[in-house]
């Protein structure tokens, strides 16, 4: 293959030999559409900064919704998200370099009000993963720390006549399994890849607490070192009030979860992260996105 377009929601491949590192070959990638490049591997950043490929940076929430939009064969998403920002085609339209010319976002008017129309791609290959498959090929997420958009991605590619590849860790040998635990039906999947060494996150092999299979009355976390980042996180934590719902992004802000733990106020607030996890103590570093 060559001149591939990569669609990912956030941070696909951050370290070593994982993720997009597999695509580090000359001419293999010509375009990328993503929601986060902060943890992206160097070769992708170099291609973007060097004007070697077309690159778009869209809101993660829009790209997450786009998976369902593509699955239902809708033309795109109409929203006010991004108006008068970097997303607005009157400014930069989410384009990341000079090589990127085509507008994938249009400014439209409905009922006299301005909206942005994010055009839906037509995906033809999906690479997803789960934990287990049963005798019928149904996919289970029993050890996953998050369930992500895997079902919508599989539906989008399948409904577009494409190829769906699913990586999994283990086979379920039981004759009967709880159907409520099956997340992706086998008819959406074309190929399975068995990886018995599949890890839960980049740095965690398997943690039953992150997958929600077990719970602790009080989680055990190491205190983060006292530095400028912690001082900033502590100052932000002073703004928290009982029953607040707090969304934490990757970076300094995720330290607020550690502060909430240290001060024993995490039970009085609800911590969330952009990946969709609600409650608990959000993970930091390469465990970010889990809790």
Which stretches of residues belong to each language-model region?
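Conserved alpha/beta enzyme-core scaffold
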Residues: 1-291
């Amino acid at each position: 293959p060559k001149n591939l377009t990569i669609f990912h929601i956030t941070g696909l491949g951050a370290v070593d030999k994982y993720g997009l590192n597999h695509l580090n070959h000359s001419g293999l990638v010509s375009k990328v559409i993503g929601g986060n490049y902060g943890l992206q591997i160097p070769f992708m950043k170099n291609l973007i900064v060097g004007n070697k490929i077309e690159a778009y940076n869209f809101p993660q929430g829009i790209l997450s919704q786009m998976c369902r939009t593509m699955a239902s064969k809708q033309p795109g998403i109409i929203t006010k998200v991004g108006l008068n920002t970097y997303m607005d085609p009157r400014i930069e339209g989410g384009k990341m370099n000079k090589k990127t010319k085509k507008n994938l976002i249009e400014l439209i008017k409905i009922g006299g009000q301005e909206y942005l129309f994010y055009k839906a791609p037509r995906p033809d290959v999906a690479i997803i993963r789960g934990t287990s498959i049963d005798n019928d090929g149904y996919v289970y997420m029993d050890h996953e720390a998050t369930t992500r958009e895997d079902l919508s991605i599989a539906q989008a590619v399948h409904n577009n006549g494409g190829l769906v590849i699913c990586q999994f860790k283990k086979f379920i040998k039981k004759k009967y399994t709880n159907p409520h635990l099956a997340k992706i039906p086998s008819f959406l999947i074309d190929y399975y890849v068995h990886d018995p060494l599949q890890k839960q996150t980049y740095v965690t092999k398997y943690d039953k607490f992150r997958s929600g299979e077990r719970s602790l009355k009080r989680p055990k976390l190491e205190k983060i070192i006292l530095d400028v980042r912690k001082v900033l996180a502590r100052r932000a934590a002073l703004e928290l009030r009982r029953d607040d719902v707090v969304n934490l992004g990757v970076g300094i802000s995720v330290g607020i979860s550690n502060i909430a733990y240290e001060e024993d106020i995490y039970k009085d607030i609800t911590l969330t992260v952009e990946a969709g996890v609600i409650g608990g103590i959000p993970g930091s570093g390469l465990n970010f996105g889990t809790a």
